[in-house]
Amino acid sequence: MTENRKKKVATVKTISKLIKNSAGLIVFEYQGLSASELESVRNDLKNHLANTMVFKNRFVKLAIDKAGFKELDSYLFGPNIFVFFDEEHKNATIKKIAEIEKKNKFVKIKAGIYEEKVVSDAEVRVIATLPTYEEALTILARSMLAPLQQVSLGLKMLVDEKHIKAE
């Protein structure tokens, strides 16, 4: 095997490991971004603990075919950034990518892998609207406390109007 071929095989293995070890992957197009804008996007995603990489589409196709996500092949054309993220930060990362897409007309979400399924760009945008784990817990806690707060407020109003005596 030639040296060049060995490097290519190693790259495909690296991509395969990234796919296997991450909770998901988002593919987005970045054609038209300047180098500084691209670096800014990568830094934003790095702050959300996402692994942002640029690979040849052919290498990614080989790796995703091996991983069983062949449906993603049709989205791999043009200049793409591949964002790998872990389970803990998946929703926050997807929200950040959607936010970047809204701010920058040159960034276009194409597709991704989320919870072991290939998802389209529209599905990625829907996922971005879902609350993060922490936000969901806050919503749950708030909804559980609301009835108790209403009872407490009602009792306080009765005491204030002297319908009942506070002891």
From Swiss-Prot:
User: Which CDD domains does the UniProt record give?
Assistant: Ribosomal_L10
Q: Name one GO cellular component term.
A: ribonucleoprotein complex
One GO biological process this protein is involved in is:
translation
Instruction: List the molecular function annotations (GO) for this entry.
Output: large ribosomal subunit rRNA binding
State the UniProt keywords alphabetically.
Ribonucleoprotein, Ribosomal protein, RNA-binding, rRNA-binding
Fetch the Pfam families from UniProt.
Answer: Ribosomal_L10
Tagged with keyword DNA repair = no
What family name appears in the similarity comment? Answer: Belongs to the universal ribosomal protein uL10 family.
PANTHER family, per the entry: 39S RIBOSOMAL PROTEIN L10, MITOCHONDRIAL (PTHR11560)
Q: How is the quaternary structure described?
A: Part of the ribosomal stalk of the 50S ribosomal subunit. The N-terminus interacts with L11 and the large rRNA to form the base of the stalk. The C-terminus forms an elongated spine to which L12 dimers bind in a sequential fashion forming a multimeric L10(L12)X complex.
Instruction: Tell me the function of this protein.
Output: Forms part of the ribosomal stalk, playing a central role in the interaction of the ribosome with GTP-bound translation factors.
Protein name per the record: Large ribosomal subunit protein uL10
Species assigned in the record: Mycoplasma mobile (strain ATCC 43663 / 163K / NCTC 11711) (Mesomycoplasma mobile)
